[in-house]
Amino acid sequence: MSRIDDYRRVAIPGTVDFILKLAEQAKGRRFLHVTGGRLGGGAAETLRAAGPILSELGVDTRWEVTGGDNAYYTTARSLQAALEGAERVLSEEGLARWVDMNGLNAKKLDLEADVTVVHDSQPASLVSARDGGRWVWRCHFDCSSAQAGPWAFFRRFVDQYDAAVFPLPGFEGRLGIPMYVVPPSIDPLSERNGDLTPREVSEILMALGVARDKPLLVQVARFARAHDPLGVVNAYRLVKKHHDVRLVLAGTADGDPERLELLSHLLEVAQEDRDVVVLELPPEAHRQVNALQRAATIVIQKSTREGFGMMVAEAMWKGKPVIGGFAGGITAQLIYEVTGYTVNSVEGCAYRIRTLLNDPELAAKMGQDAREFARWHFLITRNLGDYLALLATLLR
């Protein structure tokens, strides 16, 4: 059985056959993706799964990664933050270094393809070196509130593309090129989302030091203020007055000083309360994340600022009720009182946690509905169809 056929048991009926028909039109074409890294993030996971499938279907698919020095990465991170709306000071020297380093990347990488998709901001200026083919900028974040100066600088490069693709309507900035919407997706058969036996889940949690003797509230997210882990702790404390629960906060700090400071504070909280577990996991800890989400009674994603927030879809696919912040793509995934709850405050988060703890049948039904909603809208099979349709459109 071919890899694409493995998805027939999880995808909506007819989806795989639709992909096969679209792939016939794209056979022999060369499809290139360029990212700033191979680890972490929904884009990387999608590409790891989609590339081999498309190649199997006769669409030559490659994945290149840009690199650089510390100054390059520092500027790239600051530029990304500014494009997401954060206040950042970007020096002309730093931006020039970013452009120059991508110029070096363009000379090192094989950029020859019929369609080249460049993901997010770090490698975006590669387009200046384009030599034939169609080029697409794939944005995975909300740039609708980008800082004016950085956006004006960045737009000079994005407008050189043939099209831009955004995860949701409303996430786009002002551009002079065609724009499309393709929501991201999860791979239901990956190590991060594939089935685990109850024994496997128990063994992984035991190795992580997470006891299962009481209901688990779980948030998996980078240790960043945008994901409000301190707000989650405060919501847990309110719930703890009424229910004996355990809170697990798992994620990465990525070596960022501000995130490391936040992680240090959370570790202090965990030392004072044995029912708060803080786990710093490497980006490749997919199996551990899978087990934590499956063991959760309730999954929380209390972001105050968010891109699409694929952690929500991951938890939904695992049949879990999710309480999320009213931010970014979380609101597109959580249908209020059907697949989960969106909240704006610590008190609201605590109230909805108590609602679900007090009504296990409601929590179970919400989890079932969440899984079906994810099946219809957020699996990689839908994403493959979208990309193949985009490929056909660009090559007409």
Question: What is the meaning of each model-derived region?
Answer:
Residues 205-227, 233, 247-248:
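Conserved donor-binding/catalytic core segment of Leloir-type glycosyltransferases
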Residues 259-291:
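Nucleotide-activated donor-binding/catalytic signature segment of Leloir-type glycosyltransferases, i.e.
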Residues 290, 313-317, 331-332, 338:
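Short alpha-helical segment that forms part of, or immediately flanks, the ligand-binding pocket
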Residues 312, 321-324, 334, 342:
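Short hydrophobic beta-strand element within catalytic cores of glycosyltransferases
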Residues 336-347, 355-360:
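Conserved acidic donor-binding segment of nucleotide-sugar-dependent glycosyltransferases
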Residues 355, 362-377, 383-389:
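A short, well-ordered alpha-helix in the C-terminal region of glycosyltransferases
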